[in-house]
């Protein structure tokens, strides 16, 4: 007794110093566990990398638990951190109104308090595992050590070592078992040292509340019953705790077992059911010793052992003979996982899909791992509004509702087609330092998100990007020339093909008011022909383009008219001017088009090749940086307009060792609609084999920059190379790429090749501009067709561009997750919020204002005029609206030698409207039909415009100025923690 008193006093006194507190900001005074199944599942072992990852993604640690010096020293010695651990935790998510949208608790069935456990369950556990645990006669007892049991186990181990005993008895108490399966590596005891660590850790934990341990010992029993590992079930995963164990392995609910085994509740329940419940509880208590055996192959042995323990318990007077006999008469009936899977159903609503998917991506975890983290998070989504919009989009499949909304008519839908259209909607709100996503939903009920997860040809929405680039160039020219005198301007002589520079200089010469806004307005009033009669040399060949309406073909509209009415040819011609401007901004590039016999060209070309080659090599390096070989090739081929010749040239260059069979399989996969005979395949394989063409010729044939082709090949051979390695290795290739210009006899052939290469380089420049404004892909298709959508886009990325325009040219981070709270009420607690700061100016505010005005005209009298006057505030004040429409009819076409279309296979049809609603809200709405069925549809962007118009009554209450979409500012992602200290968990 004296020893127990001394032990209790000294350990409890020491344990009182092992504290932690929640402090502002980040701290280094914390030690996270490095192993242990419990710590791994809860995410505690991963917290260092998760916190670092989040800080790289614009999160900041606002509060973090800090260890006392004593606790820090204790854990540095390798002992497990003492605190009242959670037996149930999981992912909890709030929406922007602080309303719960997900509350996943694992395990799902457990006891909140010791008093809730039926005495029969406790006595069964203690009889099997730790009979003296709750002995009232020893108030100071250490639950970590059962000395008689420990001595017996030690003798057993000695006997086994001397080979005089076959099996050894275990000496673990429930307290040390909990330490083992929660915190030891792999949940196992690998050595005597590990056993000692478990015992010391359990002892300190037991005495942390004081020298008397009865309540701590009750907590041990409660924790064990709630958390004991019971193998992994098919289709479910890990099973922990008696409650989940009963349901998963036997299909029995914990509440029913409690009723059957509680003498105050079971008087009217059949004895046979009581016996079965007791048998199941006993079986799981026994099975925990070897769960993966007893719960699968060893079920007969488990039945036999359960019978034995039932008899022994009856002999000990713990159960009466009638209950014993009732239990012995039963057999364990395990769940048939094929016929009755133990599936955990998670609400599949779009709010949850979006948020869980975003969280998993943010943390680099699977959804299974994510749900089991000890984590609370908040999203910027408004779940109430999202549900209303989702319901609305689903109802559009009903012909009667679609008719009510006005979706039938020319360039819209017919009643029999309403169910085949998919709709996707995203709504953002402009905050002080972020673009907050309030709604992100569709009517597909699928995790895949059309807004973010797709590359779609969205047609005329690309005109917004082209017009943005154009106005940015005008602003650049204003900055360059706006302060020069008229005389100085008259001395300038830009190239005759650089029409944008020429216009800017002429404008500044003749206009007294040299401020930027009038110049931008004048630039929007420039006229471009809509004629379809011209053939354009672009993308390596001659192309013609058409307008949507034939009556536009004879027009000569201003750019703002062309945007308002979405006329194609003015934007194709504008893109040509932008390409030429880009070419002539580099003096080196311009010189290539000058005198073919200039003797300085060779020396210049060498310098040009080295300098320009490195510029483009770096761009391509960044394009492929961090990608695997397969991802690099996918990215490359996505940007290549596929023909048999181009693909053959690229494949034979990048994979020279490939067999004819591999080569044929590659072409047939990439060109499923093209019939390639064996003879044609052999011809291509031979003609473009290694050494048949130089690197520049290979690039010319494939219509790609030769250095991009070279870099792909180099990275295949040297995947660990740095950019410096690549630059050094490509010295000769950089000279070769540009040197071929002087080896062709005819200047026209030289100029033709030069124009192709310069166009590729110009589109690389343009891509940098687009990327700065949120363009989501690694490349643009180097063709004027990019002006009308051939490079693809994502609706969400276009919406971000609208946000930049609405925000006076300042790009803010797009936010869906704004608060994270890990490990609440534990020593590992950490709260993170979004890093607040200034946005990035990516556009002159004058350019943004000009674009807002242009987009407003699309609604006031253009392709989105259906919306005119439709959105009003609650007091009747009309909202200022603007946007851009676009329709994509995406096909795979086979073209004959004469240019005629031989076959046309529909891939999908899209219609998109990107918009702003008032000063703070913006977004995108897309109608989409995938696959060949899209050939039956003729809807245009009038469809999403009409759908948005029908949504007005739903959106109106959330668009009020200052209402923050009916969201509230959240201080935390979960309830405020209890006072920091030693006991800090829920249950």
Regions found by a protein language model. Give the residues of each.
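Acidic/histidine-enriched alpha-helical segments
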Residues: 141-147, 238-247, 302-304, 315-334, ...
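Short, glycine/proline-biased beta-turn/loop segments that scaffold the active-site neighborhood
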Residues: 458-555, 693, 699-719, 812-830
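A penicillin-recognizing enzyme superfamily signal
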Residues: 379-427, 437-452, 466, 510, ...
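Flexible glycine/proline-enriched surface loops and loop-helix/loop-strand junctions
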Residues: 34-35, 105-108, 199-207, 263-268, ...
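Extracytoplasmic
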Residues: 45, 49, 85-91, 96-99, ...
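Acidic helix-start/capping segments at beta-turn-to-alpha-helix junctions
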Residues: 64-81, 138-162, 196, 242-245, ...
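N-terminal type II signal-anchor transmembrane helix
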Residues: 1-101, 400
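Non-catalytic, structured segments within soluble enzyme domains
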Residues: 1-12, 17-19, 27, 137-141, ...
């Amino acid at each position: 007794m004296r020893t127990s008193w001394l032990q209790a006093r000294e350990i409890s006194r020491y344990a009182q110093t092992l504290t932690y507190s929640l402090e502002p900001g980040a701290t280094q005074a914390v030690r996270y566990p490095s192993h242990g199944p419990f710590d791994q599942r809860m995410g505690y072992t991963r917290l260092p990398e998760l916190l670092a990852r989040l800080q790289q993604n614009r999160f900041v640690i606002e509060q973090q638990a800090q260890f006392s010096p004593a606790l820090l020293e204790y854990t540095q010695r390798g002992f497990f951190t003492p605190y009242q651990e959670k037996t149930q935790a999981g992912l909890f998510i709030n929406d922007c109104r602080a309303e719960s949208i997900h509350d996943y608790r694992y395990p799902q069935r457990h006891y909140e308090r010791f008093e809730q456990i039926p005495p029969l369950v406790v006595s069964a556990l203690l009889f099997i595992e730790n009979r003296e645990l709750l002995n009232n006669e020893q108030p100071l007892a250490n639950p970590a050590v059962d000395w008689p049991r420990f001595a017996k186990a030690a003798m057993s181990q000695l006997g086994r070592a001397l080979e005089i005993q076959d099996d050894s008895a275990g000496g673990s108490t429930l307290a040390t078992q909990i330490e083992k399966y929660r915190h030891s590596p792999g949940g196992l005891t690998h050595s005597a040292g590990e056993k000692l660590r478990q015992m010391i850790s359990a002892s300190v934990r037991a005495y942390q509340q004081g020298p008397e341990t009865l309540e701590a010992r009750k907590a041990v029993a409660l924790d064990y019953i709630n958390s004991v590992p019971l193998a992994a079930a098919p289709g479910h995963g890990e099973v922990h705790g008696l409650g989940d164990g009963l349901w998963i392995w036997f299909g029995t609910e914990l509440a029913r077992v409690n009723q059957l085994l509680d003498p105050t509740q079971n008087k009217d329940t059949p004895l046979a059911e009581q016996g079965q419940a007791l048998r199941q509880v006993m079986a799981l208590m026994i099975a925990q010793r070897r769960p993966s055996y007893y719960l699968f192959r060893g079920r007969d042995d488990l039945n036999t052992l359960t019978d034995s323990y039932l008899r022994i318990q009856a002999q000990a007077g713990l159960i009466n003979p009638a209950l014993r006999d009732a239990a012995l008469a039963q057999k364990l009936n395990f769940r048939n996982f094929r016929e009755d899977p133990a599936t955990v159903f998670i609400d599949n609503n779009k709010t949850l899909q979006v948020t869980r998917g975003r969280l998993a991506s943010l943390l680099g975890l699977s959804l299974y791992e994510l749900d089991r983290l000890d984590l609370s998070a908040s999203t910027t989504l408004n779940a109430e509004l999202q549900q209303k919009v989702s319901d609305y989009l689903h109802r559009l499949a009903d012909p009667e509702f679609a008719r009510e909304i006005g979706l039938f008519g020319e360039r819209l839908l017919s009643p029999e087609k309403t169910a085949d259209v998919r709709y996707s909607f995203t709504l953002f709100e402009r905050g002080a330092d972020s673009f907050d996503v309030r709604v992100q939903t569709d009517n597909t009920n699928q995790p895949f998100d059309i807004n973010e997860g797709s590359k779609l040809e969205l047609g005329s929405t690309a005109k917004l990007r082209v017009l943005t680039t154009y106005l940015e160039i005008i602003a650049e020219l204003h900055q360059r020339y706006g302060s020069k005198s008229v005389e100085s301007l008259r001395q300038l002589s830009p190239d005759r093909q650089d029409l944008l520079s020429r216009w800017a200089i002429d404008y500044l010469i003749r206009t007294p008011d040299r401020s930027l806004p009038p110049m931008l307005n004048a630039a929007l009033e420039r006229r471009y022909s809509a004629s379809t009669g011209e053939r354009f040399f672009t993308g390596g060949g001659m192309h013609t383009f058409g307008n949507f309406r034939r009556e536009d073909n004879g027009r000569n509209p201003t750019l703002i008219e062309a945007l308002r009415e979405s006329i194609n040819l003015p934007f194709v011609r504008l893109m040509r001017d932008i390409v030429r401007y880009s070419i002539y901004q580099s003096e080196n590039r311009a010189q290539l088009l000058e005198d073919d016999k200039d003797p300085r060209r060779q020396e210049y070309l060498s310098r040009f090749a080295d300098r320009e080659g490195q510029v483009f090599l770096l761009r391509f390096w960044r394009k492929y940086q961090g990608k695997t070989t397969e991802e690099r090739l996918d990215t490359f081929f996505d940007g290549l307009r596929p023909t048999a010749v181009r693909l053959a040239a690229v494949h034979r260059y990048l994979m020279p060792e490939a067999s004819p069979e591999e080569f044929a399989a590659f072409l047939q996969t990439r060109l499923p609609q093209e019939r390639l005979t064996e003879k044609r395949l052999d011809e291509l394989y031979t003609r473009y084999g290694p050494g048949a063409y130089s690197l520049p010729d290979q690039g010319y044939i494939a219509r790609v920059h030769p250095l991009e082709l070279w870099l792909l090949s180099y990275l295949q051979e040297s995947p660990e190379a740095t950019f410096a390695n690549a630059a050094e290795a490509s010295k000769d290739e950089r000279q070769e790429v540009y040197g071929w210009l002087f080896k062709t006899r005819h200047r026209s052939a030289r100029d033709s090749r030069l124009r192709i290469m310069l166009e590729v380089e110009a589109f690389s420049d343009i891509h940098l501009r687009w990327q700065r404004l949120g363009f989501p892909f690694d490349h643009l298709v180097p063709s004027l067709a990019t002006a009308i959508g051939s490079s693809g886009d994502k609706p969400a990325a276009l919406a971000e561009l609208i946000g930049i325009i609405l925000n006076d040219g300042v790009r803010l981070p797009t936010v869906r997750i704004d608060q994270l709270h890990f490990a609440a009420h534990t020593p590992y607690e950490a709260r993170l919020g979004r890093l607040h700061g200034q946005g990035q100016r990516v556009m002159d505010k004058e350019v943004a204002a000009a674009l807002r005005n242009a987009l407003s005209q699309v609604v006031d009298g253009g392709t989105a005029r259906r919306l005119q006057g439709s959105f009003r505030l609650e007091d009747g004040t009309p909202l200022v609206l603007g946007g851009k429409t676009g329709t994509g009819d995406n096909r795979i076409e086979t073209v004959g030698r004469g240019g005629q279309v031989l076959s046309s296979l529909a891939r999908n049809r899209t219609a998109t409207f990107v918009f702003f609603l008032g000063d703070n809200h913006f977004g995108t709405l897309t109608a989409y039909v995938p696959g060949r069925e899209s050939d039956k549809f003729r809807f245009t962007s009038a469809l999403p415009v009409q759908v948005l118009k029908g949504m007005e009554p739903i959106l109106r209450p959330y668009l009020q100025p200052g209402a923050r979409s009916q969201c509230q500012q959240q201080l935390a992602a979960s309830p405020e923690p209890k006072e920091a200290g030693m006991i800090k968990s829920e249950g």
